[in-house]
Amino acid sequence: MIFLTLEHILTHISFSIVSIVITIHLITLLVDEIVGLYDSLEKGMISTFLCITGLLVTRWIYSGHLPLSNLYESLIFLSWSFSIIHMIPYFKNHKNHLSLVTAPSAIFTQGFATSGLLTEMHQSAILVPALQSQWLMMHVSMMVLSYGALLCGSLLSVALLVITFRKNIDIFGKRNHLLIGSFSFGEIQYTNERSNVLRNVSFLSLRNYRRYQLIRQLDNWSYRVISLGFIFLTIGILSGAVWANEAWGSYWNWDPKETWAFITWTIFAIYLHTRTNKNFQGADSAIVASIGFIIIWICYFGVNLLGIGLHSYGSFILTSN
């Protein structure tokens, strides 16, 4: 009873803190950057991380196994992944735009887990025989961490596309790979006091320069986070194959979950390949990552909605004993 009460308290505290973090972030978007508000935002995400960590540890102690056995627990772990991804650049003293996606993703994920799922799915249960393995921690944790990283990176790519196409900016050209194609330029006339000759000088407006810097940062962080997520996904798939061979006698069965995991891996492998081509970067590679965003959700929720296949124990459908 104590563990359940503590879990309930930590769930509501973490949800409340991340809600406040989003509010603070909206304020920083409406006004000029304020150091105090920025620090409060970062401290809020750290507090959220600690609360969710306490929630997972409490559930682990109560259930006796790593809390990754059903959809509710995986969503909480996914929310935890968003918070830890957000803190990585913070401890390196790098200001970034990850909070644009990590905080909303954390509150959406945790909100859906606590309010969108049936109450019965919140309860810890004895692991089914297929999950009673040491590979549970390795495989499932790597997969959920990869989902978190790939979702964050994909959302950054979506933000890049929105800014690029809305403002009609083409920042990656074929000639020097970093060409500003359609920035707005202001024409300023000034008088040379010595020669009294009028000269027309074109200069890059400060607003567009900031937008250009923002796009570069989004592209850079998207690439970094997706690369990290791709590593996690690869480890998760390989460990899952070994686990499948031990449990079912085959490394690969083309189960719906396995199939979509392979499709997800292929999409982001294509994305990383496009990054090696200097003529196919920026908005072009961001389109591939945006497609990957949809594929991830199909992979993560598709099997759960269908309730079929070898991974059906994590579905929305609750089977009666």
From Swiss-Prot:
Gene Ontology molecular function terms on file: heme binding
Membrane topology annotation: Multi-pass membrane protein
Listed InterPro entries: Cyt_c_assembly (IPR002541), Cyt_c_biogenesis_CcsA (IPR017562), Cyt_c_biogenesis_CcsA/CcmC (IPR045062)
One Pfam short name: Cytochrom_C_asm
Cellular localization per UniProt: Plastid, Chloroplast thylakoid membrane
GO cellular component labels: chloroplast thylakoid membrane; plasma membrane
GO BP annotation list: cytochrome complex assembly
TM region(s), chain numbering: 17-37, 44-64, 71-91, 98-118, 143-163, 225-245, 258-275, 286-306
Entry keywords, A to Z: Chloroplast, Cytochrome c-type biogenesis, Membrane, Plastid, Thylakoid, Transmembrane, Transmembrane helix
Superkingdom of the organism of origin: Eukaryota
Family statement: Belongs to the CcmF/CycK/Ccl1/NrfE/CcsA family.
Quaternary structure (record): May interact with Ccs1.
Described function: Required during biogenesis of c-type cytochromes (cytochrome c6 and cytochrome f) at the step of heme attachment.
HAMAP family: CytC_CcsA (MF_01391)
Protein's name according to its UniProt entry: Cytochrome c biogenesis protein CcsA
Organism of origin: Buxus microphylla (Littleleaf boxwood)
Lineage: Eukaryota, Viridiplantae, Streptophyta, Embryophyta, Tracheophyta
